[in-house]
Amino acid sequence: MNPNFSSMIDRYKHQQLRIGSVSPQQISAWATKILPNGEIVGEVKKPYTFLYKTNKPEKDGLFCERIFGPIKSGICACGNYRVIGDEKEEPKFCEQCGVEFIDSRIRRYQMGYIKLACPVTHVWYLKRLPSYIANLLDKPLKELEGLVYCDFSFARPITKKPTFLRLRGLFEYEIQSWKYSIPLFFTTQGFDTFRNREISTGAGAIREQLADLDLRIIIENSLLEWKDLGEEEHTGNEWEDRKVGRRKDFLVRRMELAKHFLRTNIEPEWMVLCLLPVLPPELRPIIQIDGGKLMSSDINELYRRVIYRNNTLTDLLTTSRSTPGELVMCQEKLVQEAVDTLLDNGIRGQPMRDGHNKIYKSFSDLIEGKEGRFRETLLGKRVDYSGRSVIVVGPSLSLHRCGLPREIAIELFQTFVIRGLIRQHLASNIGVAKSKIREKEPIVWEILQEVMQGHPVLLNRAPTLHRLGIQAFQPVLVEGRAICLHPLVCKGFNADFDGDQMAVHVPLSLEAQVEARLLMFSHMNLLSPAIGDPISVPTQDMLIGLYVLTSENRRGICLNRYTKCNRRNSQTKRSDNSNYKYKKEPVFCNSYDAIGAYRQKRINLDSPLWLRWRLDQRVITSRETPIEVHYESLGTYYEIYGHYLIVRSLKKEIIFIYIRTTVGHISLYREIEEAIQGFSRAGSSDT
């Protein structure tokens, strides 16, 4: 990472960050520093961390102060001190140890590098599926793995001169004919000459092939092949048709990958490393615990392993010219495996473990997953003015309201309450206001109520998979320690009331509050953004509640007709059930009397009753034949239907209409009626 990366983000206010491959020159530029004496530092050459006698970082080691900066601000390795930021202080580097007089926070972003003795493929681009290297080269992954890990070699096609292997024709026959012939040259002193002229193996062979690629030609050829395959007719052979389909999918991926490299100005050979970046030491610390013992990040041990093997390979290539070629290639394979373990431990099979049989955490383990660098500290970090609690159902709440516990509300809105106390001259300063809040004086809750009326809150349930995973609500104070939520908004959150937790946030800026009110309120998000269907629909407990509310006694009107003394029916009831006691169905003039009787426990929720209805002809539009007709002495008569009866006068005029219903039906009807009237009032006020 660039040493000026943090200041660059602050200066330009960048809103995004892109991660990708970089060139060896860029890695060197990030890590290299030039001392006043002209010495260039930045390369980590030694696998050591601290000197045990002095407890100071080893020079050119993994914690070197010359490379990564001073441990203490303004103090070099010699102990000299300079004032940071004072331009009069000269020099800015210690002439003895070469440590720069700078803030120690530089050790959080100053990088180093390891100069690899042989090219090494980046295991993410080779082993992750789909393999980018295999896609670009259009070769089987197993073949490339065998080449990278020195299991076999390629004859160099780059030279037009007649080579020994080409003259002997060893590469024109089966693999067995040359697989055992090349090692005959490995024990000679001219192995380097032989290797540079005749064969290509290891990650260097991959790098050469990637460097020779022309991405535009790859796109053109892949497109032509894709069109040719599309013009072919189906053979009728399912296996062949699938094979053609897979090839077409591969060509599409290859073209997209080549376009991505062209669009981002990334060279394919950068997927093979020549310089290995070394993380800043503060990101892989060594901590001293009780008893003088040291705890080190696993990354340090993996870096040490890479440096040990790389230094061994360097010695074999430089000091011992008579080293057998098989030993050199074996050491190159060890370097490749060490870098693989550093980047992604276990990607090639059995992961590397320490002496306690614990798996080392590689670079991939540090950044991926829920506890990785991105999700834990960059994306999912804790923020101020937020809380978290279990959600419970709040059936009495409006759709756009949520119940906030007092304990959470007073913490979230504490600064606003303090300002309110001071403005109303109820507290002289912040300390007095906090004291009143701790003592939970009644005036505190009154001011809190006023503050909450003007501040929406945001509720979020992880994982936030779509925009309805976070919605705005108007908070109201509730007792207890759980957040109350209207059950109709649960589908958008994919939440239920079996122990789910939700986070609550307070939008502070004016822009955030406007966005919450205009776009994020729950009553404004009634449709699914994906398919447009209603998302605030009754489910689960609400459906059961509606069923119970609208269920009624199963006896039916035919078994208990409206009659003051139907002895035949009552005798039938008594014969069927000895415990049955006939009760005449009550009659009510309005719904308020019926609900009042239910609250007084004179009737049940599902008890059938007769309710006088307003003269609404819609209930008798069906030309239904009455079940019974009862005549009174005064000439009035009753027409009894399935669920209603009509009282008519002698002139056949309708006097009253009674409907047969239950208290549950009445309650549901009143709720629907109030909702319709509310929408009507809202519509009339808007117009």
Swiss-Prot record:
Cofactor dependency: Mg(2+); Zn(2+)
Catalysed reactions listed for this entry: RNA(n) + a ribonucleoside 5'-triphosphate = RNA(n+1) + diphosphate
Major place of residence: plastid
Disulfide bridge map: none
Localization (cell): Plastid, Chloroplast
E.C. no: 2.7.7.6
Cofactor note: Binds 1 Mg(2+) ion per subunit.
Swiss-Prot/TrEMBL GO biological process terms: DNA-templated transcription
Top EC group: transferase
Protein name as it appears in the record: DNA-directed RNA polymerase subunit beta'
Organism the protein comes from: Ipomoea purpurea
Gene: rpoC1
